[in-house]
Amino acid sequence: MGGCIPFLKAARALCPRIMPPLLLLSAFIFLVSVLGGAPGHNPDRRTKMVSIHSLSELERLKLQETAYHELVARHFLSEFKPDRALPIDRPNTLDKWFLILRGQQRAVSHKTFGISLEEVLVNEFTRRKHLELTATMQVEEATGQAAGRRRGNVVRRVFGRIRRFFSRRRNEPTLPREFTRRGRRGAVSVDSLAELEDGALLLQTLQLSKISFPIGQRLLGSKRKMSLNPIAKQIPQVVEACCQFIEKHGLSAVGIFTLEYSVQRVRQLREEFDQGLDVVLDDNQNVHDVAALLKEFFRDMKDSLLPDDLYMSFLLTATLKPQDQLSALQLLVYLMPPCHSDTLERLLKALHKITENCEDSIGIDGQLVPGNRMTSTNLALVFGSALLKKGKFGKRESRKTKLGIDHYVASVNVVRAMIDNWDVLFQVPPHIQRQVAKRVWKSSPEALDFIRRRNLRKIQSARIKMEEDALLSDPVETSAEARAAVLAQSKPSDEGSSEEPAVPSGTARSHDDEEGAGNPPIPEQDRPLLRVPREKEAKTGVSYFFP
């Protein structure tokens, strides 16, 4: 506005009549640019908070860019680099050739404890694919009848593998492409293609599914193309199994995560997970042993669940007010890798359920149900140092930044706030949604249009499903009752009679409730027999946003 003052003075000196329109135009531009709209315009009314898992990979990238710039403006990122290196997809070349020269083959790793989270997911994915391939080969060998036919199948498989080996791309990573973050979700899925109304949009969709961006615009430095599909959740098997068992059997266990446990049974479970076995936690397991196993997984993990380069940024949120702390934690969660944020959400969900049962309550049968005595503060004391580990980046930041309070106390405060507000941390507020949409539109308007149309189809399908569920929950009256209701309304009653016409129960309604007092009543036969409750219509939980 300061640069417009000389122009307004010159315009006033030349022509005083144009001053009022210029002032109105300047005020309108100021409202649109600074406040985000004209007076009375509130875009938040039609926009709701959406889950971070409903965003596509492209939207997740723009969300990270938005969170990065927001945190930089608040001076929360000191050592975090936008172009930080990703985990290497290929193994060490020297180690690889050394094993080849020695005639040894690298065994498939099944380890789960004591390694990084990315390596845990890689091992699980590789083990699952190996089991599927082994089962397929066994089925093929079992279906062969004659020896010649089996010999032909073996020769065909060998030549097929040789052909695929020489025809593959040389720059293909060693890890499965479906797992690596660089090659994940490279095209539109079959479900997305099935949602298209006509085949004319097929080519456009395939082109939009592989949008490329300059390296300078990529927050995480990935060179591969982004997808318009959401990212699948990536949670280790041991975390999911332990959380499910605790939610089923441990909500009423007093002092969970703090009482003594059997070291031998925990070591046995740990060895089973490290061997790649399909471990099933049944009712015979002790809940304290499972809780200790979950705690050991995060404590012995090679990296920190909350990234090391964001260590000091998380601790700085402990010095803020509760509302400001929650907003800063949201932005920091957006910057986390998807596998870390998914695992953190699963853990916080289980811990929050434990805190909901910390106090004594009365059961359905009227008996007193003792609480587990584990509040969010007690759980934060247990998991504070396990989730926030100080690595080399954290040590460097701690020397540069003076926090003012002890790091352990700050970590407990941060973890407690995350447990209490776990459901809000992984939601995207409306004003962040608009910024993400603007960034997507600047990079590719066609991609934003495709995302809008897909979200609109999701809303329509959710409404149809809601109406079907409402019809199933509110069954239609039998034909005899409906016919009796119509006859009762159409039959004239005697003027001197004080008796009301016989109407089956459930058909008569108060006119003051629907038509309003003083208005003529609507005949019952004109009303539809099938009605969808309005309160159920607002519980779809599906939303989309516009810039």
From Swiss-Prot:
Rho-GAP domain sequence ranges: 226-426
Listed Gene3D superfamilies: Rho GTPase activation protein
Pfam families: RhoGAP
Ranges of compositional bias, category Basic and acidic residues: 524-539
Tissue expression profile of the protein: Detected in the outer root sheath of hair follicles at the level of the stem cell bulge, during the anagen and telogen phases of hair growth (at protein level).
Superkingdom assignment: Eukaryota
Presence of the UniProt keyword Signal in the record: yes
Any single biological process term in GO: signal transduction
Example GO molecular function: GTPase activator activity
Family matches, as SUPFAM superfamilies: GTPase activation domain, GAP (SSF48350)
Region (Disordered): 485-547
InterPro entries xrefs: ARHGAP6_RhoGAP, Rho_GTPase_activation_prot, RHOGAP6/36, RhoGAP_dom
Site (Arginine finger): 258
Sorted UniProt keywords: GTPase activation, Hypotrichosis, Signal
Function statement: GTPase activator for the Rho-type GTPases by converting them to an inactive GDP-bound state.
Summary of subunit composition and partner proteins: May interacts (via the Rho-GAP domain) with the active form of RAC1.
Disease: Bazex-Dupre-Christol syndrome: An X-linked dominant disorder characterized by a triad of congenital hypotrichosis, follicular atrophoderma affecting the dorsa of the hands and feet, the face and extensor surfaces of the elbows or knees, and the development of basocellular neoplasms including basal cell nevi and basal cell carcinomas from the second decade onwards.
Protein name listed in UniProt: Rho GTPase-activating protein 36
Native organism: Homo sapiens (Human)
Gene: ARHGAP36
